[in-house]
Amino acid sequence: MNINMKDNFKKWLDLQQKKTLLKFLTCGSVDDGKSTLIGRLLHDTKQIYDDQLFFLKSDSKRHGTQGNEIDLALVVDGLQSEREQGITIDVAYRYFSTNKRKFIIADTPGHEQYTRNMATGASTCDLSILLVDARKGLSEQTYRHSFISTLLGIKYLIVAINKMDLVNYKQEIFENIKKDFLIFSKKLANDLNIIFIPMSALLGENIVFKTKLMPWYQGVTLLSFLETIKIKNSISSEELRFPVQYINRPNSDFRGYSGILLSGRMHVGQTIKILPENINSRVSRIVTFDKELKKAEIGESITVVLKDEIDINRGDFFVNIDSILQPSQEAIIDIVWMTDNILLAGESYNVKLSGKKIRVYIKEILFRLDVNTLKKVKSHSLVLNSIGRVKIYFSKPVIFDNYSENRMTGNMIFIDLLTNITVGAGMIVNSLDKKGKIPSNKQKDFESDFYDLIIRHFPHWNIPKILMKKVYK
């Protein structure tokens, strides 16, 4: 009996490991039914346990909006303030699986003031579900979330036209919304894959089970589409990208370079190039925490041992021997600003790029994007939740790809010099291939260095708040 249980468990584990993972997010206007949709997916795929259902029934009586029925939106509206207001504030993540696939869902806020939260959720997703209220049609928030999804590199959009039960399942309404969105989508990226599904998240129609109330719709259910869609990886399987995250030297006999293989393949005996030093070497070993490998694939966490003794630092890149990738010191980026302190030309920040922290200087704000109309607006600053395009200088040449070519090596986060708080997320549009000395603000550099000295060695002085006010003045 025990042997059979072990065999069955091993088979189950093997099956789980072979399943592909799809990460998607839900977004749209407030009260379009994002949280209800996720709750319905989890409920109808039997992912909610009995004890969770018990507490869900109890919470539905206190906070729910469905009378005596279970309010499935409460499955993901976890914060007390969310349940009281009936809205989503933070990004809520949920995990579930079916017999065909594993899923990670990000339920993102619909309010404009939570644009930064939505951008955070979209940054790691492969697909976006845009909820549209069939009674209201497309809204400004629908346009904004469509644009942010594509800005963050998402190529697959499902336009879920929800609450069809409230418009008597009329095909004409569905077709009009579909037509309007297709016209709008011409302003977005050219290589989008868009599918339209009429549904009712509240009643569970066309979510997991096909409804008979919309015979004019001949397509598949939402779950069926999610289970079968094949996401084309925008990362080239040929272009090797291995940024060094850690120098692994447990003893004098071993020196390895640890990190995640972001793209391409690596094998023992392969000749590689190390950037930015532009030095060639050969892979002698590839090891993990428990074994040695002959080759490594995208996404694997590995430690690489080289044949030659080379001075390699955190943030250096291993690339193909024939790679044309070169260090650059200037770039144009799209940025989502995430703090109350406004972004101005001339400011300096730390950025984290492929595991490497480096100083950048904001040379110029090219424009701000009105995400509701997609118009470029001339601006000298960016405020909280603004999206714009800026030109930046790095303090020294660094390695990166364009975000459209490789999301992993083309993204960066901006970090405040004084508080170490993440203040922005950047997506590299292109390199300007210029090298030079970074313009500096000597007074501000001195103040930030002085601030670091005080909080590290003299925290009892209680000076940081005074300094911060002075710097931000």
Swiss-Prot record:
SUPFAM superfamilies per UniProt: EF-Tu/eEF-1alpha/eIF2-gamma C-terminal domain, P-loop containing nucleoside triphosphate hydrolases, Translation proteins
Keywords assigned by UniProt, alphabetized: ATP-binding, GTP-binding, Nucleotide-binding, Nucleotidyltransferase, Transferase
Top EC category: transferase
Role, per record: With CysD forms the ATP sulfurylase (ATPS) that catalyzes the adenylation of sulfate producing adenosine 5'-phosphosulfate (APS) and diphosphate, the first enzymatic step in sulfur assimilation pathway. APS synthesis involves the formation of a high-energy phosphoric-sulfuric acid anhydride bond driven by GTP hydrolysis by CysN coupled to ATP hydrolysis by CysD.
Region (G1): 28-35
Membership in a protein family: Belongs to the TRAFAC class translation factor GTPase superfamily. Classic translation factor GTPase family. CysN/NodQ subfamily.
Protein name in UniProt: Sulfate adenylyltransferase subunit 1
InterPro entries the record matches: CysN_GTP-bd, CysN_II, CysN_NoDQ_III, G_TR_CS, GTP-eEF1A_C, P-loop_NTPase, Small_GTP-bd, SO4_adenylTrfase_lsu
UniProt-listed GO biological process terms: hydrogen sulfide biosynthetic process; sulfate assimilation
Region (G5): 200-202
Region spans: G2: 86-90
Coiled-coil residue spans: none
A Pfam family hit: GTP_EFTU
Top-level taxon: Bacteria
Region G4: start-end pairs: 162-165
Residue segments, region G3: 107-110
